[in-house]
């Protein structure tokens, strides 16, 4: 829909364009001229403002009054001099009036409307006054007018008195004062020469109509009532001797006669008695267009050159127009584009790494418009670029939407529902008769070096800690042991999570798959920060806790202190009246290990319903995964429900394939794995992530499609996470100052959990904003030649965690100069990379005062300016050093330099304390006796 213009709105309201422009200026809207277009909301405000100001319709009031015909039976006021005749009171019955002879009785008439006619023709005041005086003189010499009596139905004259057609021929009548000759009035706007040209042949006339269209409901024009006027040269006037004046219809105003250059006679009201002949064309050479008199009622407009003409019709707005206006009102403009807005409570759910196109589909908007809006908000992005949650929050707040980013769990659940897989619904549909008891899954948690792995080693009667570098568990291990309970053996599955803070995410996943948590606390150290962190993870997962107080055989151990400290965190021992079992153990001597297993089984039987359905496809979690040189991708999985068999098609995260072989923690082959059983699976296409869910599908194709969709989702999430938000100001500054420095890393590790934990730890390193840490690639396995090629292109450093490069990769790295660093303990990797980032920072400088000199005398020289005679109070004054002048503690001159330094007549490089000298500060001459000259130097500030 086209936008309205100012002059159109002014014409619709009935005011001139200047008034509308002035009102717009008051409203604060910048509009150039009457032809400028404005927005529909601004148009509505303009109309409301004009209506409130009381100026609406003032310009259109005279025209409306003239166009409205008098109602039947309405009383009219006394005729005014110079006005048109108005109908008098309408009696119910009136006798017929005989037509008087023209020679005896003059025809009753009212004064001419000379003033109105001259005003409409825009004549000068002088000509109007002269004609008005002549009209009054003629009216005074005429016979007093008799009241005209009208009947409801005026009789038609006899057939012999048919009037001549109103074709513009002058008619004789009562003598009237001689009007000025047309064409001789230099002040008149109409210079017609009396005789009208043929209608339609005047190329300069504003009215090109070939005749006036009869009024609606009338068969012809009404006969004009006789009016006084001077005889015009030409044919005799009809209605003369022997012809009576045809009275007007009931309640109708008699139509006026046409006149040169003036307004033509008024058209009869619809429904008036019709008369024979043709309607008179518009009078005058350049008369006002339209033959409908002053008022342009229905049918009053002049016909156009090729058919129906007339004035501008005012039709009602269609539903489509109103709907378009409503949509424009509901979609305001932002940044020059129209976008739909929310009410502030509209929730829009987006997946991780969503793009502007995804957001546009949710709110039914154009992606290009949203890109423009985001650009005006200071963010630059393309329509298909993955954005982070913070950027969507900014955009949603501006548009009135609440952005809700779907969690990874919900996103994966929705993805599986697309393949008709609903894991939660499967568990709800299972009956109690198909559920069987499964072993409990226990997670060992605690602080670093509190003996978690040593305790698990004592339980398994095997030494697994010797294979860990530095005695620190680097990846998750899952084992199943058998313990005697009430006369028979029962299985317990243990998951050993690393205690270092870098593996927080891995420990969190361990708490999500566990049934019972064993919190290991050293009796000599007591509660430590990671002990509280592990406790919070277990409580957040709503997991029962069994506390193992380790190292009770060590000197200085105080198990009672541990019980007292844990009481502050809501863990109250049974001996203190609580419900948490505390067991004193010694992993070194094996004391209390059997009591600990007994406590685990009692806790499982008391408060947990450990049952699952083994007779269905397997579902579970990948505990850890690694890339074996001879066996390929190997994943340690924990079956939560169902049975996993060799040959099943499985998908775990972004990896898929068929189970080629399964082995337990001892390396023995397993053909079937039941619930709560940890096994190593071979046959996956890639290495899944630690904590990824796995499931068995009916076909390989389904597993591959699920893996590909998960990979795309994860890729978008990584792109959104790695995206650097940059504003317009930062972008301009970056263009001026150059590229921001960054340290690119490639991380390769032996297991996926360690790689992920190392990546998260590196991203937490806090350095200055001028240096960025970018991890461009991560993977599991040895460093390959492709990794070296990628590092060559991006100037990256390769970090190897418990892996080594192959010979080709080592040779290419030496040839290309790629830095490859290998670590077996995570502490060393974090420290060295943090040092590298700190070394890339730009040096920081600070001001150091080097000397202060007091001005004792000022020597003025026409060649060198003012020279300060000083004495050095402290430090050393050095030539070319930066200086500032201080007067009464206020700096009066800054960014100066010691351009000349002399002792007596010799130039010197420095002057020490308590020596006098002469100092020249170049063009700076605002120095006085008593001022101080302070010299400073910039020294590099060491980083902490």
Curated annotation (Swiss-Prot):
Binding site for GTP: 446-453, 496-500, 550-553
UniProt-listed Gene3D superfamilies: 1.10.10.2480, P-loop containing nucleotide triphosphate hydrolases, Translation factors, Translation initiation factor IF- 2, domain 3
Subcellular location, principal: cytoplasm
Region called G4, residue ranges: 550-553
Chain segments carrying region Disordered: 55-326
Record region (G3): 496-499
Region of interest (G5), ranges: 586-588
UniProt record similarity statement: Belongs to the TRAFAC class translation factor GTPase superfamily. Classic translation factor GTPase family. IF-2 subfamily.
Job of this protein: One of the essential components for the initiation of protein synthesis. Protects formylmethionyl-tRNA from spontaneous hydrolysis and promotes its binding to the 30S ribosomal subunits. Also involved in the hydrolysis of GTP during the formation of the 70S ribosomal complex.
Protein name: Translation initiation factor IF-2
Source organism (scientific name): Clavibacter sepedonicus (Clavibacter michiganensis subsp. sepedonicus)
The encoding gene: infB
């Amino acid at each position: 829909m086209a936008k309205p213009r100012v002059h159109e709105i002014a014409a619709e309201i009935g005011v001139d364009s200047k008034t509308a422009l002035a009102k717009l200026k008051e409203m604060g809207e910048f509009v150039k001229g009457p032809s400028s277009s404005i927005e529909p909301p601004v148009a509505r405000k303009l109309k409301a403002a004009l209506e409130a100001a009381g100026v609406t319709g003032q310009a259109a009031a005279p025209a409306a009054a003239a166009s409205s015909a008098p109602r039947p039976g309405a009383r009219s006021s006394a005729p005014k001099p110079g006005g048109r005749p108005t109908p008098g009171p309408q009696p119910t019955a009136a006798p017929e009036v005989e037509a008087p002879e023209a020679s005896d009785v003059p025809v009753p008439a009212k004064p001419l409307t000379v003033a109105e006619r001259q005003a409409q023709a825009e004549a000068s005041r002088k000509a109007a006054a002269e004609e008005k005086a002549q009209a009054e003189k003629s009216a005074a010499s005429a016979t007093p007018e008799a009241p005209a009596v009208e009947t409801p139905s005026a009789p038609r004259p006899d057939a012999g008195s048919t009037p001549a057609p109103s074709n513009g021929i002058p008619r004789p009548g009562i003598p009237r004062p001689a009007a000025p000759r047309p064409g001789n009035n230099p002040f008149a706007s109409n210079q017609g020469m009396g005789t009208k040209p043929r209608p339609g042949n005047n190329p300069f006339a504003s009215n090109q109509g070939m005749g006036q269209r009869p009024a609606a409901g009338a068969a012809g024009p009404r006969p004009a009532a006789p009016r006084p006027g001077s005889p015009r040269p030409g044919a005799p006037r009809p209605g003369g001797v022997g012809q009576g004046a045809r009275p007007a219809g009931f309640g109708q105003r008699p139509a006026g006669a046409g006149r040169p250059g003036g307004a033509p006679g008024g058209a009869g009201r619809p429904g008036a008695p019709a008369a024979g002949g043709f309607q008179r064309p518009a009078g005058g050479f350049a008369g006002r267009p339209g033959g409908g008199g002053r008022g342009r009622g229905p049918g009053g407009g002049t016909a156009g050159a090729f058919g129906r003409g007339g004035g501008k019709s005012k039709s009602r707005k269609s539903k489509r127009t109103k709907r378009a206006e409503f949509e424009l009102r509901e979609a305001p403009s932002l940044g020059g584009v129209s976008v739909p807005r929310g009410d502030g409570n509209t929730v829009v759910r987006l997946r991780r790494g969503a793009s502007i196109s995804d957001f546009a589909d949710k709110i039914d908007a154009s992606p290009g418009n949203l890109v423009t809006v985001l650009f005006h908000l200071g963010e630059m992005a393309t329509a298909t670029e993955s954005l982070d949650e913070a950027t969507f929050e900014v955009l949603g707040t501006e548009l009135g939407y609440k952005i809700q980013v779907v969690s990874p769990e919900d996103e994966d659940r929705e993805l599986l529902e697309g393949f008709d897989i609903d894991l939660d619904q499967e568990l709800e549909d299972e009956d109690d008769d198909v559920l069987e008891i499964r072993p409990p899954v226990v997670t060992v948690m605690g602080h670093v070096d509190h003996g978690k792995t040593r305790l698990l080693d004592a339980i398994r009667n095997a030494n697994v800690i010797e294979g860990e570098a530095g005695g620190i568990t680097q990846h998750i291990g899952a084992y199943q042991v058998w313990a005697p309970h009430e006369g028979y053996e029962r299985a317990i599955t243990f998951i050993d999570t690393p205690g270092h803070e870098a593996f927080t995410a891995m420990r969190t996943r361990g708490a999500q798959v566990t049934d019972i948590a064993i919190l290991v606390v050293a009796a000599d150290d007591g509660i430590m920060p990671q002990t509280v962190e592990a406790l919070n993870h277990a409580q957040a997962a709503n997991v029962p806790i069994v506390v193992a107080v380790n190292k009770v055989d060590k000197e200085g151990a105080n198990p009672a202190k541990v019980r007292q400290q844990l009481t502050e965190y809501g863990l109250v021992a049974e001996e203190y009246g609580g419900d948490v079992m505390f067991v004193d153990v010694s992993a070194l001597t094996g004391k209390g290990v059997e009591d600990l297993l007994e406590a685990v089984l009692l806790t499982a039987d008391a408060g947990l319903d450990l049952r699952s359905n083994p007779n269905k496809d397997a579902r579970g979690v990948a505990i850890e995964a690694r890339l074996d040189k001879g066996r390929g991708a190997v994943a340690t999985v924990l079956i939560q429900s169902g049975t996993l068999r060799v040959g099943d098609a499985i998908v775990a995260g972004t990896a898929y394939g068929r189970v080629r072989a399964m082995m337990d923690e001892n390396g023995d082959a397993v053909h079937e794995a039941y619930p709560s059983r940890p096994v190593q699976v071979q046959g996956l296409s890639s290495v899944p992530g630690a904590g990824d869910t796995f499931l068995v599908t009916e076909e390989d194709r389904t597993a591959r499609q699920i893996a590909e969709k998960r990979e795309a989702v994860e890729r978008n999430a990584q792109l959104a996470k790695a995206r650097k938000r940059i504003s317009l100001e930062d972008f301009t500054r970056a263009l001026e100052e150059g590229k921001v420095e960054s340290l690119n890393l490639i991380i390769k590790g032996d297991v996926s959990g360690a790689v992920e934990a190392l990546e998260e730890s590196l991203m937490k390193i806090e350095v200055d904003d001028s240096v960025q840490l970018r991890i461009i690639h991560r993977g599991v396995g040895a460093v390959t030649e492709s990794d070296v090629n990628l590092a060559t292109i991006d100037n990256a450093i390769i970090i190897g965690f418990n892996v080594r490069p192959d010979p080709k990769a080592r040779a290419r790295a030496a040839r290309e100069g790629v830095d490859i660093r290998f670590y077996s303990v995570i502490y060393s990797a974090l420290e060295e990379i943090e040092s590298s980032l700190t070394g890339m920072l730009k040096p920081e400088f600070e001001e150091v005062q080097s000397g202060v000199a007091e001005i004792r005398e000022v020597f003025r020289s026409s060649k060198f300016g003012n020279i300060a005679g000083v004495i050095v109070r402290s430090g050393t004054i050095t030539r070319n050093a930066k200086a500032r002048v201080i007067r009464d503690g206020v700096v009066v001159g800054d960014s100066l330099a010691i351009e000349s330094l002399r002792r007596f007549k010799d130039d010197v490089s420095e002057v020490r304390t308590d020596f006098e000298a002469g100092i020249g500060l170049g063009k700076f001459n605002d120095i006085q006796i008593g001022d101080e000259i302070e010299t400073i130097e910039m020294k590099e500030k060491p980083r902490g």
